[in-house]
């Protein structure tokens, strides 16, 4: 029977899913293509039809989900936004909710935290670094805009506020992933972010949001 494009894509995705399960369970270095083929119910030759090697397969798995920083970048259109602090707070809380409920993202992100980014895998590290750099620039732009609008507490310098938020947001996510979810990301993260943004807001901003 002739295989359709949909059949081929289903097989390819099945291989990626099998690799994800084994990478998560055993680690990348301790997972062979033979094991992935057995897990996926295909031959090793079938894997080579879709992927050049294990590194290529790993890259396909990583590319199958956006980085959480990339999700933030896609939504954080802060230029001329009437309330940039509310925008950032909402985006951050939504990101925590998504990560806390999406088991597949959790597995892939945790696989990535265990990876030594050497050789061909360095491009994954470069992708993360690029996304983090862009996210930080957006945070700074948002806090600068909030300051210009009189919405940022004058006790905070915009860049200091942006860095503080960045370190809290990224740091708690990385700790949660690295140390195997040792706290409630959504509950603790929500309380921390809301508390920090309460400190960020000027009196005028708080009045505007409660009006």
Question: Would you name each region that the model predicts?
Answer:
Residues 60, 74-105, 158-165, 186-190, ...:
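Hydrophobic alpha-helical connector segments
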Residues 86-87, 100-129:
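Amphipathic alpha-helical segments used for helix-helix packing
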Residues 25-29, 80, 102, 149:
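Short coil/turn segments at alpha/beta junctions that flank glycine-rich nucleotide-binding fingerprints
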Residues 97-101, 114, 118, 141, ...:
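Amphipathic C-terminal alpha-helical segment
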Residues 1-26, 30-42, 55-59:
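Basic, helix-initiating cap at the start of DNA-binding domains
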């Amino acid at each position: 029977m002739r295989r359709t494009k949909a059949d081929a894509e289903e097989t390819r995705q099945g291989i990626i899913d099998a690799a994800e399960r084994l990478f998560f369970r055993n680690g990348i270095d301790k997972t062979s293509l033979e094991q992935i083929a057995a897990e996926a119910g295909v031959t090793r030759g079938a894997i080579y039809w879709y992927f050049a090697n294990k590194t290529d397969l790993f890259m396909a798995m990583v590319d199958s989900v956006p980085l959480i920083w990339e999700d933030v970048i896609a939504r954080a259109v802060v230029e001329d936004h009437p309330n940039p602090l509310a925008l950032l707070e909402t985006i951050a809380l939504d990101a925590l909710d998504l990560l806390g409920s999406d088991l597949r993202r959790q597995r892939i992100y945790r696989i990535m935290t265990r990876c030594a980014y050497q050789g061909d895998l360095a491009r994954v590290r470069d992708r993360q670094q690029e996304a983090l750099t862009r996210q930080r620039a957006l945070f700074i732009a948002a806090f600068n805009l909030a300051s210009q609008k009189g919405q940022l507490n004058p006790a905070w310098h915009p860049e200091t506020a942006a860095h503080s938020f960045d370190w809290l947001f990224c740091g708690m996510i990385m700790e949660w992933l690295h140390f195997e979810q040792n706290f409630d990301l959504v509950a603790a993260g929500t309380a921390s972010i809301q508390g920090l943004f309460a400190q960020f807001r000027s009196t005028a901003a708080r009045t505007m949001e409660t009006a």
